[in-house]
Amino acid sequence: MGGLEEVFVKEAFDTNWIAPLGANVDGFEKELSEYVGSKTGAALASGTAAIHMALKAVGVKKGDKVFCSSLTFAASCNPIIYEGGIPVFIDSELESHNMSPVALEKAFKAYEEKGEMPKAVIVVNLYGQSADMDKIIKICKKYNVPIIEDAAESLGATYKGKHSGTFGEYGIYSFNGNKIITTSGGGMLVSNNEEGIAKVRFWSTQARDKARHYEHTELGYNYRMSNIVAGIGRGQLRVLEDRIAKKKEIFETYKEAFKEIEDIEMMPVCEYGEPNYWLTTITLSENSKVKPLDIILALEKENIESRPIWKPMHIQPYYKEYEFYSHNDEEEISISEDIFNRGVCLPSDTKMTKEEQERVIKIIKGLFK
């Protein structure tokens, strides 16, 4: 916690505004939207809810196709199923680990030949690094398909000076407990489409029509953020830049420590932007004698948590029957599978002390001796 969260939460209690509306909800929506440079936003129960509402806002219905990054967490694509849509997974590129414009173009051409188009493209900004949005936007504009930018992991990151999450028709952020700022649970949908956000607020409060009695002409959802949770978010937003600076320091410390180990490659930091360094990830060379599981188990033995990189959606048991477009059809495995096979997420908590990080580094270095 940054310190001011208690002030905003106390205000909610003192004024007896603890429902999913109030000064903190309004304030959090306004302050975060202004921070990222978007016209408006809707504070919601989760990032997943935000993706769901974005899909509904762009008109996804039963049977509609939605292109989505494969190398991501399941919350990026589960809402497609909620609306009866059909996900089509898109591979990554090595340069950013994010959606491959090459694979995206392949998917569009294939669907053009079929005589149909996806209803939307969900672009995920993995581990705080923005996708190459100029290339992706150019492709999506060519086929007149809206972008939903999943910036759950990349709040505060920029692409060519513009904030991650503000490039599509809608952008989403997550404030889950593990994100760069947290409300314990929550999300935000941002857009320059003020009418669309107003509709999302309506759907998210059970789609109650304006009437003296309870009247409903549309299906609604219990997706709005509470005034208490929003108060935590307002306090957290005030320390976001400090968090990003600390995350970058953690990344740079790992980078310096591992620079002599040829088999360790740090996560990409693309010249086109600045990530928020949410998680520091590494990939090991194909010929490395040390494998990702060796690192995970060695740290686990010392009660230190690390994790594999996200398992791509197109090889997940639930989603393996859905279509997938690869970056390079000539390779035996996709780029996203390759990153998964060779990748590790290292401890990156902003509360981690220098001594604790040095302990992590010492354990990993010891495996390569």
Residue ranges and their predicted role:
Residues K56-L126, S130-K142, P146-A151, T158:
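PLP-dependent aminotransferase-like
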Residues G47, G84, D150, K179, ...:
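Conserved G/P- and acidic residue-centered "switch" motifs that form tight phosphate/ATP-binding loops
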Residues M1-I18, P347:
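N-terminal "arm"/small-domain region of PLP-dependent enzymes with the aminotransferase-like
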